[in-house]
Amino acid sequence: MEKFDIAMTVFLVMIFLFIFLPIIYMLSNPGDLNQLLDKEVIEAFKTTLLAGAVATLIALIFGIPTGYILARYDFKFKSFVEAVLDLPMAIPHSVIGIIILSFIYGIDIINFIGRYVVDNFWGIVTVYLFVGIPFMVNSIRDGFLSVDEEIEYVSRTLGASKIRTFFEISLPLIKNNIISGIILSFARGISEVGAILIIAYYPKTVPILIYERFMSFGLDASKPISVGMILISIALFALLRMFGRMRGR
């Protein structure tokens, strides 16, 4: 190898180890895993995974038509719309909580929604949806962009309606993008802490419980639950990589 290649490889190894070593150390020193059988921990996992599933389903329902429109149509202010849809990825997490709370209580006609959002399961779903929708929309939009419009055109010239072409031709061709969007949106949602602290501390999600255990009892008390979340994250991104390879074939 040339010196340049060696230098580049050193940077790769350093950044890889920067991420890999702490994770491996954590997994090899998980603390008392019996904590994962604690009723409060089990309930937190149930709440987190269920809220993540509901938010991801809603994101999917809205993400498919949104991604299709962004991929297939040009319209005024399209760039602005795309920028707004991407904003949740750039806004600090705690600020997202303030934004949602301010909107709910700042507009009189929707004040009543507060009782269903603040310290409520649906508040968790709302936050998860807010932070996860950009990943769903972007993945699906990229999928539609990768489908040759000529295929859809041929389908319609052969007598298929636009809606039939959409469901029988376009959607099946982007199934891996849809799955990737689901995984990314779900993973982003269940990892949220800052906005949840402000909107819905209760019922407790896993990240909130980890934060609470750490603040109350220290590092050792938070490690086993953290390991549980790490394993879920690894499983999700293993699936993502698998479907990514399938999409590239």
From Swiss-Prot:
The chain crosses the membrane at residues 6-26, 49-69, 94-114, 117-137, 178-198, 224-244. It is found in: Cell membrane. It comes from the Archaea. Residues 1-5, 70-93, 138-177, 245-249 are cytoplasmic. Keywords: Cell membrane, Membrane, Molybdenum, Transmembrane, Transmembrane helix, Transport. It is a multi-pass membrane protein. GO terms for biological process: transmembrane transport. Residues 27-48, 115-116, 199-223 are extracellular. The keyword Membrane applies. GO terms for cellular component: plasma membrane. The keyword tRNA processing does not apply. Signal peptide: none annotated. CDD domains: TM_PBP2. Residues 45-240 form the ABC transmembrane type-1 domain. InterPro entries: MetI-like, MetI-like_sf, Mo/W_ABC_Transporter_Permease. Belongs to the binding-protein-dependent transport system permease family. Part of the ABC transporter complex WtpABC involved in molybdate/tungstate import. Probably responsible for the translocation of the substrate across the membrane. The complex is composed of two ATP-binding proteins (WtpC), two transmembrane proteins (WtpB) and a solute-binding protein (WtpA). This is Molybdate/tungstate transport system permease protein WtpB. It comes from Methanocaldococcus jannaschii (strain ATCC 43067 / DSM 2661 / JAL-1 / JCM 10045 / NBRC 100440) (Methanococcus jannaschii).
